[in-house]
Design a protein with these regions (language model features):
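Intrinsically disordered, low-complexity linkers and terminal tails enriched in Ser/Thr/Pro/Gly
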Residues: 1-172
Length: 172
């Protein structure tokens, strides 16, 4: 598998759906789309979750997302519904996403950022940002997810509550 343009400044991955309040003791999950025709190496990519004064970071150090693929980052791969996802990545073992009563993402309010750090730099740049609860109008109840409408990756109005989550089935 060749990875092209892995170090360029305008890498694009899209966070397309987020499950922060799973039902029936299910796993939290983040759906990521690679819309490019080339694979993207995960080295240099990171996730950040902030809620109140608490912040959690996860730097990905290996892995590749194939071109035009859909990936699920999950708190528990064994209980995750995967739909048409090409890749399923366990972030529960890394302590970033939870399952059941163990929360990685705050149920009530939070900010989730997908970030990329250039190989010669130390500071990551946000590639996408999702916010719920707090000052937003996005208040989740158990079993609802947040889904991206395909527009601005930083605008909270680009996100809506989904009553029937669709892990691994983004068609944008």
């Amino acid at each position: 598998l060749e990875v092209h343009d892995g170090g360029r400044k305008n890498n694009v991955l899209h966070v397309t759906e987020v499950m922060a309040r799973p039902a029936s003791s299910g796993p939290e999950w983040i759906e990521i789309s690679n819309p490019n025709h080339f694979a993207v190496a995960l080295k240099g990519w990171s996730l950040n979750h902030t809620s109140g004064s608490t912040s959690t970071n996860l730097l990905m150090q290996s892995g590749v997302l194939s071109g035009q693929s859909l990936s699920l980052l999950t708190g528990d791969p064994s209980s995750q519904v995967v739909g048409n996802a090409t890749h399923v990545v366990d972030l529960g073992s890394k302590g970033f996403l939870g399952v059941g009563q163990l929360d990685g993402l705050d149920n009530n309010q939070g900010v989730l950022s997908l970030r990329y750090t250039q190989l010669d730099e130390t500071t990551p740049s946000d590639v996408a940002r999702i916010q719920w609860g707090g000052g937003t109008e996005l208040f989740l109840i158990t079993g609802e997810s947040l889904v991206w409408d395909g527009s601005d990756r930083f605008d909270e109005s680009a996100w809506a509550i989904q009553d029937d989550p669709t892990p691994g089935d983004y068609d944008g």
